[in-house]
C-alpha cells in the first residue's frame, strides 16, 4: 500500500512537475504552432487570393495584349496598304519620269543626229557648190557674167540716202565748219592768182606752220582761242612769221586766226587741210590729178594690207623725221611715186595724230577725189573690169548716190565673182565669196 501511495505521490509529483513546468511550455509551443498554422493558413488564403487576382490580371493583360496586338496589326495593315499605295504612286511617277526623260533623250538624240546630218550634208553641199562655182568662174567669160548680173541687180536699187563727206570737216562742230569754209574761200581766191610754184611754197609753209602749232600747244591755244579782237593774234603772227613765209601764207594765217574755232586742235586741222588743197590744186594745174588720186588709193590699200607699216607710220613715239624717212623708203622701194603724191603723203605722216595711217591716207585720197566733186567707190573684183563694165558701174553708182563717182578697183581672186563696193561708210556686197560665206554661217552648229 505504502508502495502504491509512494508511487501515487511520485506520480502526482511527476504530474505536478509536468503541469507546472512541462505543460506550459508545451502549451505555449502548441499555441505558437497553432498561431503559426493560423498565420500560414491566412497567408495561404492571402496568397490564394493574390494568385486569383494575379490570374485575373493576367487574363486581363492577355486580353489587353490581344486587343493591342489586334490594333497594332490593324494599324500595321493600314500602314502597309498606305505605303504600298505610296510606293505604287512613286513607282508610277518614276516610271512616267523615266519614260518622259527617255522620250526627251530620244528626241534630243534625234535632233542632234538630224543636225549632224544637216551640218554634214550642208557642209558637203556648200563645199560642192564652191567647187562648182570655182570651176564656173574659172572661165573669164563666166566670171564677167557674174559682174554683169550684179550690175543688173545694182541698177534696180533705189537711190541711196548715204551722205558722203570727205576731208578735215568731217569731225568739226558747227563753228569750226563755218570757220573752215571761210578759210577755204580765202584760199580759193588766193589760188586763182597763184602759179604752181607759189602753190608748192604755200603748201610747204602751211605744213611747217601746222607742225609748229602741233609741237607748241601754248601758241596754238593763243591763236585758236575765241576773242572779239583778232588784232593781237595778227600782230603775234607778224612777229613770229613776218619775213619767214610768203604773203599768201600770211594772208591765209590771218584769216585762220580771225575765225572762231570750236576746239584748239581744229586750227591745226584747218591749216593742214588748206596745205593739202594747195597741193591738190597744183596737181590739177599740172594735169596730174588722176595720177595722184590713183597713187594715194594704191598706197592706202598697201597700208590696209600691212598693219605693222600702218602702225609704225602713225606711232607718236617715233619722231616725225624717222617716220617720213620710213615713208620715203617704202615709196622708193615701190619704184617711185608722183612728187605731189609724195608731198601729200609726207604732210600726212608728219602731222598725223589720233588716227591710223591707213585711215589718214584714205581720207586724203577721198579729199583728192572730192576736190573734183566726185565720190570714191572702192571696188573689189575677182578680175579686172572691162571698159564697158567700168563705165556702166560708174553710171549706176553716180545715179544711186546723186554725184559723180570715181572707181578705185582692186583685184582679189578670192572674191570669185560679182563685186564688193564701198562708198563712204556704205558697203554693197555682191561678191560670190560673201554669199558662200553666208551659206556656211547659216549651217546648223
From Swiss-Prot:
It comes from Mycolicibacterium vanbaalenii (strain DSM 7251 / JCM 13017 / BCRC 16820 / KCTC 9966 / NRRL B-24157 / PYR-1). The chain crosses the membrane at residues 3-23. Keywords: ATP synthesis, Cell membrane, CF(0), Hydrogen ion transport, Ion transport, Membrane, Multifunctional enzyme, Transmembrane, Transmembrane helix, Transport. The keyword Membrane applies. The gene is atpFH. One of its GO terms (cellular component) is proton-transporting ATP synthase complex. This is ATP synthase subunit b-delta. One of its GO terms (molecular function) is proton-transporting ATP synthase activity, rotational mechanism. F(1)F(0) ATP synthase produces ATP from ADP in the presence of a proton or sodium gradient. F-type ATPases consist of two structural domains, F(1) containing the extramembraneous catalytic core and F(0) containing the membrane proton channel, linked together by a central stalk and a peripheral stalk. During catalysis, ATP synthesis in the catalytic domain of F(1) is coupled via a rotary mechanism of the central stalk subunits to proton translocation. This fusion protein includes a component of the F(0) channel (subunit b) and of the F(1) subunit (subunit delta). Two copies of subunit b and one of delta together form the peripheral 'stator' stalk which links F(1) to F(0). CDD domains: ATP-synt_Fo_b (cd06503). InterPro entries: ATP_synth_B-like_membr_sf, ATP_synth_b/b'su_bac/chlpt, ATP_synth_OSCP/delta_N_sf, ATPase_OSCP/dsu. F-type ATPases have 2 components, F(1) - the catalytic core - and F(0) - the membrane proton channel. F(1) has five subunits: alpha(3), beta(3), gamma(1), delta(1), epsilon(1). F(0) has three main subunits: a(1), b(2) and c(10-14). The alpha and beta chains form an alternating ring which encloses part of the gamma chain. F(1) is attached to F(0) by a central stalk formed by the gamma and epsilon chains, while a peripheral stalk is formed by the delta and b chains. It is a single-pass membrane protein. Residues 1-168 are annotated as: ATP synthase subunit b. In the N-terminal section; belongs to the ATPase B chain family. It is found in: Cell membrane. Residues 169-445 are annotated as: ATP synthase subunit delta.
Amino acid at each position: 500500500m505504502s508502495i502504491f501511495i509512494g508511487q501515487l505521490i511520485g506520480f502526482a509529483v511527476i504530474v505536478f512537475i509536468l503541469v507546472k513546468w512541462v505543460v506550459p511550455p508545451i502549451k505555449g509551443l502548441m499555441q505558437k504552432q497553432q498561431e503559426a498554422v493560423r498565420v500560414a493558413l491566412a497567408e495561404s488564403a492571402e496568397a490564394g487570393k493574390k494568385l486569383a487576382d494575379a490570374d485575373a490580371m493576367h487574363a486581363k493583360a492577355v486580353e489587353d495584349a490581344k486587343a493591342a496586338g489586334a490594333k497594332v496589326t490593324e494599324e500595321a495593315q493600314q500602314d502597309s496598304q498606305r505605303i504600298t499605295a505610296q510606293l505604287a504612286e512613286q513607282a508610277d511617277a518614276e516610271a512616267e519620269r523615266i519614260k518622259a526623260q527617255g522620250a526627251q533623250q530620244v528626241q534630243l538624240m534625234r535632233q542632234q543626229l538630224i543636225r549632224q546630218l544637216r551640218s554634214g550634208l550642208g557642209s558637203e553641199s556648200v563645199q560642192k557648190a564652191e567647187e562648182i562655182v570655182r570651176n564656173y568662174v574659172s572661165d573669164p567669160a563666166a566670171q564677167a557674167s557674174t559682174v554683169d548680173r550684179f550690175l543688173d541687180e545694182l541698177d534696180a536699187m533705189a537711190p541711196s540716202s548715204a551722205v558722203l563727206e570727205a576731208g578735215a570737216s568731217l569731225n568739226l562742230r558747227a563753228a569750226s565748219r563755218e570757220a573752215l569754209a571761210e578759210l577755204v574761200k580765202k584760199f580759193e581766191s588766193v589760188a586763182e592768182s597763184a602759179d604752181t610754184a607759189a602753190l608748192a611754197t604755200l603748201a610747204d609753209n602751211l605744213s611747217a606752220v601746222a607742225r609748229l602749232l602741233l609741237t607748241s600747244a601754248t601758241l596754238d591755244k593763243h591763236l585758236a582761242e575765241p576773242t572779239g579782237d583778232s588784232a593781237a593774234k595778227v600782230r603775234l603772227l607778224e612777229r613770229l612769221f613776218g619775213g619767214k613765209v610768203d604773203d599768201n601764207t600770211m594772208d591765209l594765217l590771218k584769216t585762220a586766226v580771225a575765225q572762231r574755232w570750236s576746239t584748239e586742235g581744229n586750227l591745226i586741222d584747218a591749216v593742214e587741210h588748206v596745205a593739202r588743197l594747195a597741193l591738190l590744186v597744183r596737181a590739177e594745174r599740172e594735169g596730174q590729178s588722176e595720177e595722184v588720186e590713183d597713187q594715194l588709193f594704191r598706197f592706202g590699200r598697201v597700208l590696209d594690207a600691212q598693219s605693222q607699216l600702218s602702225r609704225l607710220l602713225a606711232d607718236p613715239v617715233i619722231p616725225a623725221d624717222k617716220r617720213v624717212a620710213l615713208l620715203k623708203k617704202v615709196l622708193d622701194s615701190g619704184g617711185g611715186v608722183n612728187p605731189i603724191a609724195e608731198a601729200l603723203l609726207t604732210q600726212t605722216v608728219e602731222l598725223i595724230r589720233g588716227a591710223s595711217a591707213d585711215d589718214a591716207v584714205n581720207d586724203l585720197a577721198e579729199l583728192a577725189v572730192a576736190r573734183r566733186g566726185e565720190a570714191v567707190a572702192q571696188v573689189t573684183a575677182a578680175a579686172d573690169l572691162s571698159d564697158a563694165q567700168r563705165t556702166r558701174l560708174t553710171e549706176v553708182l553716180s545715179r544711186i548716190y546723186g554725184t559723180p563717182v570715181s572707181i578705185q578697183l582692186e583685184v582679189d581672186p578670192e572674191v570669185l565673182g560679182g563685186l564688193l563696193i564701198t562708198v563712204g561708210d556704205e558697203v554693197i556686197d555682191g561678191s560670190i565669196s560673201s554669199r558662200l560665206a553666208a551659206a556656211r554661217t547659216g549651217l546648223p552648229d
